[in-house]
């Protein structure tokens, strides 16, 4: 489960690069939305991973 949290975090960082860095001007809105979606997914899977261990 922790593996998924790391994967979602990496995807969020890549989306942030495109969205906030101005690399893909046409897809800025989508990249910003994807960034927040994947950050939330990373946090949720990280918390679930911690709850499963304890």
UniProtKB/Swiss-Prot annotation:
Q: Which one Pfam family would you cite for this protein?
A: DUF1328
Alphabetically sorted, this entry's keywords are:
Cell membrane, Membrane, Transmembrane, Transmembrane helix
Where does the UniProt annotation locate this protein?
Cell membrane
Membrane topology qualifier: Multi-pass membrane protein
Q: Does the keyword Cell membrane apply?
A: yes
Kindly list the GO CC terms recorded for this protein.
Answer: plasma membrane
InterPro entries xrefs: DUF1328
Q: Which residues cross the membrane?
A: 5-25, 28-48
Family under the similarity heading: Belongs to the UPF0391 family.
Q: What is this protein called?
A: UPF0391 membrane protein Aave_3864
Q: Which organism is it from?
A: Paracidovorax citrulli (strain AAC00-1)
Phylogenetic placement of the source organism: Bacteria, Pseudomonadati, Pseudomonadota, Betaproteobacteria, Burkholderiales
